[in-house]
Amino acid sequence: DDTNDAERLSVDPVMRQVVGGRAVDHRAASTSQMARVETEVLTQPQNLSALIALPGKWIDCVRLAKPIKKLILDLDSSVSETYGQQEGSAYNGYFRCECYHPVFCFNQDGDVEATLLRNGNVASAHDWRVVLVPVIDRYRDLDVAKLFRGDAAFAIPELYEMLEAEVPVRYPLARERGPAS
């Protein structure tokens, strides 16, 4: 399904320029070629690792050209509603739907530093380390004020103990509201 537009885009002049190479004068990749890339090339472990690291590498390039004065990392989960029998999709009682429950780490400019697609029935803070630790590692030696934000789901001792031990990071965390008085 991810390659639905490949045939139409394979003859698009702008897409052919973006792809480059033979595509400039001929067609860009067909649906079957795109499907092979997705299933045979992108799923190789080294390629998955490269794809996961790509947003950070891009942000690092921008940061070299335009240094930042402070770093704000914002960790948050979201809902991605699903339909049909998609692998990993599950009912989430909080969102009241069949979904995936991805977690994102954004920076102060709203750029996605890292993300992880998760099953729909996991808790909001599930696998926070997988997303946050590589981002913190990238910024460890950067000499700027660092702030971490997260909602109540991330107000867990393991997370803020790691922040205190690893790097000097301030962290206002939201607390769940109690019943209204």
Where are these regions (language model features)?
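Short, conserved catalytic/metal-binding motifs centered on acidic residues
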Residues: T3-A6, H26, T31-M34, L71-V79, ...
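Electropositive, glycine- and tryptophan-enriched low-complexity nucleic-acid-binding patches
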Residues: N92-L142
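Short, surface-exposed connector motifs at secondary-structure boundaries
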Residues: Y139-K146, A165-P168
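Active-site-proximal, Lys/Arg-enriched surface segment
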Residues: G21-V103
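Short acidic, glycine/serine/threonine-rich loops at helix termini
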Residues: V18-G21, Q46, T82-G88, E113-L117, ...
